[in-house]
Structures are given as C-alpha cells and as structure tokens.
C-alpha cells in the first residue's frame, strides 16, 4: 500500500498519482488514512430471480454485493426457467444495451455491473452455440440429475451421463 491521490472522471477512476500531483478539481474528498481498493468481482452468484423471489431478488442481491465492495458479478443459471436458449435469455436476463422490460428491470434494479453464464446441459444441445451470440460470457453444466422436485430450475442445465455430455 502507498499514499496516493486518485482522480475521478465521469464516476470512474481516471488517474492515480503521487500526493499533490493532480490538477485542481471541482470536488475534493479527503480520504487520508483510508484505503482505496478496487471493487471486487464475484464470479459465481445465483440470484434465483425469477422464480424464487423469496430467496433473493436481483435488486436485493446486487445491493448486498455493493455493500460488500463487489462492483461486478457473474450470474449463473438457476432461475425458473434457467437461460438455456436465446429466447429465455433475452426475456429474463438480457445483456445491457438492449431494449426490453426484462433489461429495464435488471438495469434499474442493479447498482453494480453484471454479466451472465448460460445453461449448457445435455437436454438441448442445439441451443448451446446460438446462445453464445446473445451476450453470455460462459456456460454452466451440472454433471448430475436435477434434485427431486427442482426440474424446472435445472432444465437445459444438466448432463448427468456421458452420452449427454459428449453430444
């Protein structure tokens, strides 16, 4: 750790400099004696939204992430339904920048940056590759059957045997 001045432009870190080397600013915050750290990235979250709002909603989960210093998260599929095809992904978990009711809800509900994993199980292998063009960053596959009574949460997400896995 070292002492430094931090320049912010448009809400983002723009420059880290030796103390006293930054130009005059509109606003100055004295953070002397404090640590300034980059935001954390949580690469594995399941918000269960939609489908199990009683467990955690997108809005509540992202606020908790921000409170803990996390500025980016990667959402993994286990919602109802999980994002195993482009239609579900675009309807439920659409990437930033697209216009839709789902995107508005997620954009307005999140106070941190986010991206999504897609489901890549053995039930719908034809949907895996096209999903990559919709904006997901990676795939998730469970190598077991859906737990009893939870088939809807795991649709398109499991490859419980080698036949499914190697298709």
Residue ranges and their predicted role:
Residues 1-38:
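Histidine-rich, glycine-flanked metal-binding segment
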Residues 31-109:
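Metal-associated gating/positioning segment near the N- to mid-region
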Residues 28, 41, 139:
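Receiver (REC) domain switch-region micro-motif
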Residues 8-13, 48, 59-62, 92-94, ...:
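Short, low-complexity, polar/charged sequence segments that are solvent-exposed and flexible
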Residues 79-87, 95-167:
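Histidine/acidic-residue-rich, glycine-tolerant segments that coordinate divalent metal ions
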